[in-house]
C-alpha cells in the first residue's frame, strides 16, 4: 500500500484530494478484508483441507486440486494482512521489516499464486480426459503424491528465475553477482508469462475440447456412471472466478513491465491512478483466498456429508458414538 505523503503536489489541491479519496477507498477495503474476508478464508480453507484429509478414502482428483488451492489460499491469507497494513502504508515502526522479510513474503505469495493457477489448469485438463474416457482418471487418487509434488515443485522451479530478479533488486549491494540482475520489470514479465499466459492458454484449450465433447451425442455421453455433473459446474465456476480475480493483478504487472508508469510519468495524477489500480488488483488477488472455498462449499454436494462425518468424529472422540456401539451390539447379538 501507499500513502499520499510519498509525492509532493505542487499543481493544485485537486490531486491531493483525489489521492486522499483513493487512499480512503483502499483503506476501507483493507479493513473489510481484515474483518470479514480474513477469518472467513481462514475458516473455510482449513475446513476444506481437514475434511478431505479425514475422508481420504472418498477423495477424487478434483478434491486433491482443491486441497492444494486451499493450502495456497491459507498462505495468501496469511500474507495479505502484512501487505495491506505494512510499513509503506501505516508507517508504524512495528512493521519496519527488512528486505529479507519482504522477499520471503513475496516468494510465498508468488509460489501460492502459481499453485492456484496450475491446480486450476490441471483440473481443466483432467476433466477433459474424464469426459473423453469416463471412469479412468478423476475418480482415482492413486497418484496424489506425484500430483502435489508436481504442482508445488513446478511452482517453485518455474518461479525461480523471477525470484532471482526480485532478490537481486533488493539485495544487490550485498551480492556482487546481482549487479547485472537489478531488473524488476523482467521479474514481472516472467511472472506474467508463467503465472497467467501459459495457464490461461491451457485452460482455454481444455474448455474448447470439453465443449466439443459435450456437443457430441455418443453413448459415452449418455452413460449413467460418468462423472458427477456438479464437477462441471464447479470447474466452470472455479475457472471463471480465478481468472476474474487474478487477471487485474497480472495486467498491472504487465503494464508495469512495459510502461513503468511510476518512473516514466512525471504527472502525479497518472501515478496515483496507476497505484490505486495496482492496490485494487492486489486486493482482488487476495480475495481469491476466501472466494474459492466458498464456491467449493456450495457447489460440491458431497462436501456437506464429509463435513458431518468429521464433526461427528470430533464430537464422539476416538471411541465412537453411543448409537454406533448400540448398532454394533445389535449386530453381534
UniProtKB/Swiss-Prot annotation:
The chain crosses the membrane at residues 22-42, 66-86, 103-123, 147-167, 190-210, 235-255, 276-296. InterPro entries: GPCR_Rhodpsn, GPCR_Rhodpsn_7TM, GPER1-like, GPR146. It holds the Pfam family 7tm_1. It comes from the Eukaryota. Keywords: Cell membrane, G-protein coupled receptor, Glycoprotein, Membrane, Receptor, Transducer, Transmembrane, Transmembrane helix. GO terms for molecular function: G protein-coupled receptor activity. It is a multi-pass membrane protein. One of its GO terms (cellular component) is plasma membrane. Its main location: membrane. Glycans are attached at residue 8. Residues 43-65, 124-146, 211-234, 297-333 are cytoplasmic. The keyword Chaperone does not apply. Gene3D superfamilies: Rhodopsin 7-helix transmembrane proteins (1.20.1070.10). It is found in: Cell membrane. The keyword Transport does not apply. Residues 1-21, 87-102, 168-189, 256-275 are extracellular. G-protein coupled receptor required for the regulation of plasma cholesterol levels. Belongs to the G-protein coupled receptor 1 family. This is G-protein coupled receptor 146. It comes from Xenopus laevis (African clawed frog).
Amino acid at each position: 500500500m501507499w500513502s499520499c505523503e510519498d509525492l509532493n503536489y505542487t499543481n493544485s489541491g485537486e490531486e491531493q484530494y483525489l489521492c486522499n479519496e483513493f487512499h480512503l477507498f483502499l483503506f476501507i477495503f483493507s479493513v473489510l478484508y481484515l474483518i470479514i474476508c480474513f477469518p472467513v478464508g481462514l475458516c473455510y480453507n482449513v475446513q476444506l483441507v481437514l475434511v478431505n484429509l479425514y475422508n481420504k478414502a472418498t477423495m477424487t482428483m478434483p478434491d486433491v486440486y482443491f486441497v492444494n488451492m486451499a493450502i495456497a489460499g491459507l498462505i495468501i491469507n496469511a500474507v495479505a494482512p502484512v501487505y495491506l497494513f505494512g510499513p509503506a502504508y501505516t508507517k508504524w515502526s512495528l512493521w519496519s521489516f527488512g528486505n529479507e522479510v519482504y522477499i520471503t513474503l513475496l516468494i510465498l505469495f508468488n509460489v501460492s499464486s502459481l499453485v492456484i493457477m496450475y491446480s486450476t489448469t490441471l483440473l481443466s485438463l483432467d476433466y477433459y480426459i474424464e469426459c473423453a474416457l469416463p471412469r479412468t482418471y478423476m475418480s482415482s487418487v492413486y497418484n496424489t503424491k506425484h500430483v502435489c509434488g508436481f504442482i508445488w515443485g513446478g511452482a517453485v522451479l518455474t518461479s525461480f528465475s523471477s525470484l532471482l530478479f526480485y532478490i537481486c533488486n533488493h539485495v544487490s549491494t550485498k551480492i556482487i553477482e546481482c549487479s547485472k540482475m537489478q531488473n524488476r520489470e523482467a521479474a514481472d514479465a516472467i511472472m506474467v508469462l508463467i503465472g497467467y499466459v501459459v495457464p490461461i492458454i491451457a485452460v482455454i484449450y481444455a474448455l474448447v475440447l470439453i465443449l466439443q465433447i459435450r456437443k457430441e451425442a455418443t453413448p459415452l455421453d449418455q452413460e449413467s456412471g460418468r462423472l458427477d455433473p456438479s464437477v462441471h459446474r464447479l470447474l466452470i465456476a472455479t475457472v471463471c472466478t480465478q481468472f476474474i480475480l487474478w487477471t487485474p493483478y497480472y495486467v498491472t504487472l504487465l503494464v508495469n513491465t512495459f510502461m513503468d508508469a511510476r518512473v516514466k510519468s512525471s504527472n502525479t495524477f497518472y501515478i496515483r491512478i496507476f497505484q490505486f489500480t495496482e492496490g485494487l488488483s492486489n486486493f482482488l488477488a487476495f480475495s481469491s483466498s476466501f472466494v474459492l472455498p466458498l464456491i467449493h462449499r456450495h457447489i460440491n454436494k458431497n462436501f456437506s456429508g464429509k463435513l458431518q462425518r468429521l464433526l461427528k468424529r470430533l464430537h464422539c472422540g476416538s471411541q465412537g458414538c453411543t448409537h454406533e456401539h448400540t448398532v454394533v451390539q445389535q449386530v453381534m447379538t
